[in-house]
Amino acid sequence: LGNGIDPLKVIDEYGADALRMMLMVGSTAGNDMRYSDEKVTASRNFANKLWNASRFVQMNLPEDFEPGMPAEELLDMSDKWVLSELARTAAEVTANLDKYELGLAAEKVENFIWDIYCDWYIEICKSRLNGEDAQQADTARKVLVWVLDKALKLLHPFMPFITEEIYQALPGSAETIMTQEWPDAGKMTAWPQECADFEVLMDYIKAVRTIRNDMNVHPAKKTSMTIETANPAAFQKGGAYLARFAFATDVALTEKYTGTTDGVVTVVTPAARGFIPMMELIDREKELKRLHKELEKAEKEANMFRNQLNNPKFVERAPEKLVNETRTKLAASEDKIANINQSIQALG
């Protein structure tokens, strides 16, 4: 019929691991799944992400590096967070596999590696690895390797080739990953309070970075901030993270903010409100001009997609995939318009 997929051609283009992972993620027992190049590309991108992360870790290991878990008193907030998340992921993935929920298990391993290990923990470790505290640098290296080792074992059933290749390159690795003990969450330590505090910090940092991006503030420009919160402990412990990732020069904590709101942008999360004098970092008139130009462009795009979808001939005759893509693009354009309008309102 000409509508089949030759798996060997897919493997040649994307790799066997990418195809295997695509077939697992999002699949449920008893249901058919639709093949798409986009999904295989996403799985290949994940493999590339993992490979690059492992290369970064290996490049930062000295020749005399000895793997192992550091003593608890040497672990900082981010170490305890990533180790707690690893324990949670191992427990959930094991439970999913016991119930033959392969799609859920694969998705959870991918989310842990991509979002938690690569996007957050590795980024956090960069300043520690390059810092003057040799003990902290060694602790970061040990946790990076220990977590990577366990994550590779969790991922191995789904992506056996890349996990074996990376595992073999790790210090202290055995002959093959296939014969290694499965990560047992019951043998891992978790720190619920440290983990919860770090999640509070992450929510706040994400919100600050989002609004800085929306207002086109360069990362080199830093400012003070006042944080109104009923949970000051998380922010007290996380001062270094606020300086590094929220671009704070200094942080004041308060139960109730009573300062001025003129030229101040408010950042709201479930656990805190941040008050940041953002206007001192930007050229207000120049930024408003840029935003209005972006708004005009986004409105033109939205109108184009809207006109297509309002045309009965397009909806009836165009391929279903194209119609759905147009709906998705319209929704994205409308979200963009809303975000731009919020930024314009914030600038007054």
Task: Explain the meaning of each model-derived region.
Residues 1-6, 12, 38-348:
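Feature 926 captures the class I aminoacyl-tRNA synthetase adenylation module centered on the KMSKS loop
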Residues 1-31:
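Alpha-helical recognition segments enriched in aromatics with Gly/Pro capping
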Residues 31-39:
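Short, solvent-exposed helix-loop connector elements
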